[in-house]
A protein has these predicted regions:
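Aromatic-rich, lipid-facing transmembrane alpha helices and their immediate juxtamembrane interface loops
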Residues: 2-234
Length: 234
């Protein structure tokens, strides 16, 4: 048992199993599928057909997006508002970044994230929603009495996920910065944009999915972390 700080839930480490072990059949199937998708994707990209598996990325993202909402404990106006806010703000800042080099730096999207509008894949808006919801749900496990602290921690988790993805994004033809390596402004921009989106999520979504979100966060670090380590070792 440990206490993280004021405004933070008194967290029993033995209760971690509550967030790792799915209870309902829907969650069991969903968690099994996301691990299956990413483990098979890892081996498929490495050992079978790199291009074929990377081209299925939009399908993977879309199916995962649907599963995220299937696993929400409650679908109400708060969930809809938080999702819409994350999509619109996320897509808007990406549009500014791609077309004007603002916020994140100068970069362009590749071809493996599907249909683009104004140079930005539509699925990127959905990806902002997914990242907001899953990191926000995990943040709320630790900071369940302070929306501000939960929003800050959720935004920090989003930056960490981006940090893990950035080294492999160009090789996967997801996106690439003008200077190849993502600048510091990218990570600062991510936090500054993610924080208000996270705050909306924390204040609007009253009942948060824990298990599916926890596993999806783990999957992101596992999948992209593995490729980043392989790239560093090569």
């Amino acid at each position: 048992m440990f206490v993280v700080g004021k405004g933070c839930k008194r967290f029993n480490s033995n209760a971690m199993k509550d967030y790792l072990i799915p209870v309902t059949n829907t969650t069991k199937i969903s968690v099994g599928l996301i691990w299956l998708f990413h483990i098979s994707g890892l081996f498929g990209i490495l050992f079978i057909d790199r291009e074929l598996f990377l081209e299925t990325t939009p399908i993977n993202l879309f199916v995962t997006f649907i599963m995220l909402f299937v696993n929400q404990p409650q679908m109400d106006k708060g969930v809809g508002f938080a999702a819409g806010f994350a999509f619109i703000v996320g897509f808007a800042v990406e549009f500014l970044g791609v077309n004007y080099g603002l916020i994140f730096g100068e970069y362009a999207y590749g071809n493996n994230l599907g249909l683009k509008v104004g140079g930005v894949p539509l699925l990127i808006g959905a990806n902002w929603v997914m990242l907001t919801f899953i990191t926000g749900a995990v943040a709320a496990i630790f900071f369940n009495t302070s929306a501000i602290k939960a929003a800050a921690f959720g935004a920090f988790l989003m930056v960490l996920i981006d940090l893990v993805i950035e080294p492999v994004a160009p090789k996967f033809d997801f996106w690439e910065f003008a200077d190849v390596t993502a600048p510091l402004s990218n990570y600062i921009g991510w936090f500054l944009v993610a924080f208000p989106i996270q705050w909306v999520y924390q204040t609007q979504v009253k009942l948060k999915d824990r298990v599916f979100s926890f596993h999806l966060v783990l999957v992101q670090f596992f999948f992209f972390g593995a490729f980043s380590l392989i790239q560093l070792a090569s």
